[in-house]
Amino acid sequence: IDQVALNVYFRNARTDSVYVTQFVGSEEVLQTNRFETKKETLTPLVNDTTCTYLKTPAGIFTEVTLPVEAMMEEGDSINSAKITFTRYNDTGNYWHKFGVPQTLLMVRKSEMSNFFDKNKLTDNITSYYTTYNSTFNRYEYSNIARLIIHCYNEREAWFAAHPELTIEDYENMYPDWDKVMLVPVSTVRDSKNNIVNFRHDLSLNSTRLVGGIDQIEIKVISSAFNK
């Protein structure tokens, strides 16, 4: 849906005339649009452990737990970390099939709300975006090494400031420290085709991703000094 028009007809001072008014909505004007999906519809999908889902609007995002500590133990430094999310083909025989989310934002779970509230752009440290590859039927993030390093260094800095506490203490205080969300988005571009804003995808899209409780592969290239 690109545009919705609302026509309002009313009488003014008992004269039967036609008046026109506009209800303006923009980022600067408070909007009260609300999309809601019944919980009883989403719950079985959320509880499905064989895969994960992406549904828009007001549907389901995918949460990913990154093996930060295990990856940092691979070497002295991570040069690259590539992660791919493959989607299942829709084999259902429906009269109308939903579209596939075309742009997918990866953002730290703890920063997701602030990302949209502050109209932030991806920084390739705590947030990334990619587009759907229809040839290979997947979403690919070519290098999230800076995200892995950032999460690890943030935790290590906390330990340095609180040497008396443990990993369990940190994870209890910051349970989402190693988690990211995959969020379908749409982009706004300027006249030079630069992205100037990310918005929640409000089109009718749905897809299933390979994963669920099973681990997916992250391809890591690391380096270490000979000792």
Predicted regions and their residues:
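Secreted, disulfide-rich extracellular signaling modules
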Residues: 1-227
